């Protein structure tokens, strides 16, 4: 693929930082190497000398001596080599990307670690979006994505979707305004990429089926656009077998996938990872070299030590326990909704994730209801307008999260909300 046509002028101008290059060399060098290159602080002057973390099974992860010194020091912008290696092997096991053994300049799969997947996504957007570019999304979508894209001056087009995700026929209709060969002409402004959250979409909880993904991928090939597969809730799918990913069917090297440990291990550690064609991942890393420099070394090593202790089987066992918890939480909020909101509102059963997307009947704009009146009744929800491209347009929707509240709290919240809706009709 010709990746240069997707890159912005800023991204094309990026060059490796010589300082960061020496850090990469140092991370792989033998201990006999005498380093006078980097400006790394002397760890003997760091005030922290040890740390210990107790894991849920009662075991302990300890940071002492050389490990604590490493955890508090600069590290490579790509990510810690051992964690990169573990994650690459895990991605191959989970998704078996066709591009694993491609030549580096022809879409070979690569991976880098970011400060949460939002960090990686923002860098991907800035790598790809020029003012006036056409970008495809499916509403409603996470405001963090919208607010990262909008300042870049792109033309954001909504692709119709339902409870099973993006509707391929709707995408075909949008694409029909161009000819496939138009992608070779920058003045035609053909779509540069499709952004989607395929599992447990925030806020709807909808998931894209495998069959639809195949149709969408073929359209991406026909019209030559990239796919950004933002999948933070991949490990929170409530039914097995899990649907195949876009990465698993990427024969061209046109998929950039964003993963995170935020939903399953810790949101505060801020560790995510981006997988995709080497040319594009390298550009994200070049951005990291001169911005955040690298993801937190301590956070990366905490996760690495945990993964080494667990192994793949232990990690997936933790995922199963996590899924059971959130599935029970989902069932609790559905029970509360059915008890109090039946007849007043409607919703689909979330397939994954942490959210229930609710449409109130008879109220065309829930903004005041949710932002003011519900808070007065001590119920905090998110109004739906912020999840749409035109955030000023009225909407009957709002988002309820089932991640933190107890079943009793969910029941009480929806009881209060039901009374409020009745008063507002």
From Swiss-Prot:
Species assigned in the record: Mus musculus
Self-association and partners: Homodimer.
InterPro entries from the UniProt entry: Aminotransferase_I/II_large (IPR004839), Class-I_PLP-dep_aminotransf (IPR050859), PyrdxlP-dep_Trfase (IPR015424), PyrdxlP-dep_Trfase_major (IPR015421)
Family label: Belongs to the class-I pyridoxal-phosphate-dependent aminotransferase family.
Cofactor: pyridoxal 5'-phosphate
Broad EC category: transferase
EC id: 2.6.1.39, 2.6.1.4, 2.6.1.63, 2.6.1.7
Physiological role: Transaminase with broad substrate specificity. Has transaminase activity towards aminoadipate, kynurenine, methionine and glutamate. Shows activity also towards tryptophan, aspartate and hydroxykynurenine. Accepts a variety of oxo-acids as amino-group acceptors, with a preference for 2-oxoglutarate, 2-oxocaproic acid, phenylpyruvate and alpha-oxo-gamma-methiol butyric acid. Can also use glyoxylate as amino-group acceptor (in vitro).
Family annotation (Pfam families): Aminotran_1_2 (PF00155)
GO molecular function ontology, one term from the record: kynurenine-oxoglutarate transaminase activity
Gene: Aadat
Name of protein: Kynurenine/alpha-aminoadipate aminotransferase, mitochondrial
Keyword Mitochondrion: yes
Reactions catalysed according to its record: L-kynurenine + 2-oxoglutarate = kynurenate + L-glutamate + H2O; L-2-aminoadipate + 2-oxoglutarate = 2-oxoadipate + L-glutamate; glycine + 2-oxoglutarate = glyoxylate + L-glutamate; L-kynurenine + glyoxylate = kynurenate + glycine + H2O
């Amino acid at each position: 693929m010709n990746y240069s046509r997707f890159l912005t002028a800023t991204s094309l101008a990026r060059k490796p930082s010589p300082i960061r290059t020496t850090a990469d060399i140092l991370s792989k060098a033998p201990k006999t190497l005498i380093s006078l290159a980097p400006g790394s602080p002397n760890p003997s002057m760091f005030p922290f000398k040890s740390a210990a973390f107790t894991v849920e099974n009662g075991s302990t992860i300890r940071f002492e001596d050389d490990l604590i010194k490493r955890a508090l020091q600069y590290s490579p912008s790509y990510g810690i080599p051992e964690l990169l290696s573990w994650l690459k092997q895990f991605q191959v096991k989970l998704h078996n990307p066709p591009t694993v053994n491609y030549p580096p300049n022809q879409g070979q799969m690569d991976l880098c670690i970011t400060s949460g997947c939002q960090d990686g996504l923002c860098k991907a957007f800035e790598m790809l979006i020029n003012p006036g570019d056409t970008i495809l999304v499916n509403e409603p979508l996470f405001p963090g994505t919208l607010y990262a894209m909008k300042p870049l001056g792109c033309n954001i087009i909504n692709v119709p979707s339902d409870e099973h995700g993006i509707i391929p026929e709707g995408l075909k209709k949008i694409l029909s305004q161009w000819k496939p060969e138009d992608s070779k002409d920058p003045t035609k402004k053909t779509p540069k990429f499709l952004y989607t959250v395929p599992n447990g979409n925030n806020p709807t909880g909808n998931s894209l089926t495998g069959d639809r993904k195949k149709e969408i991928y073929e359209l991406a090939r026909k019209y030559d656009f990239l796919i950004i597969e933002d999948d933070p809730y991949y490990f929170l799918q409530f039914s097995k077998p899990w649907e195949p990913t876009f990465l698993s069917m990427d024969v061209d090297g046109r998929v950039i996938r964003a993963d995170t440990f935020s939903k399953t291990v810790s949101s505060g550690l801020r560790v995510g990872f981006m997988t995709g064609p080497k040319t594009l991942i390298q550009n994200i890393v070049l951005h990291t070299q001169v911005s955040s420099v690298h993801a937190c070394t301590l956070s990366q090593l905490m996760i690495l030590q945990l993964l080494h202790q667990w192994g793949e089987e232990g990690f997936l066992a933790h995922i199963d326990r996590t899924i059971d918890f959130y599935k029970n939480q989902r069932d609790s909020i559905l029970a509360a909704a059915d008890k109090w909101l039946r007849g007043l509102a409607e919703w689909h059963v979330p397939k994954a994730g942490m959210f229930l997307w609710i449409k109130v009947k008879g109220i065309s704009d829930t903004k005041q209801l949710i932002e003011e009146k519900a808070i007065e009744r001590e119920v905090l929800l998110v109004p739906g307008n912020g999840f749409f491209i035109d955030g000023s347009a009225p909407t009957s929707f709002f988002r309820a999260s089932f991640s933190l509240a107890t079943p009793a709290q969910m029941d009480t919240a929806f009881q209060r909300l039901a009374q409020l809706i009745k008063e507002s009709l």
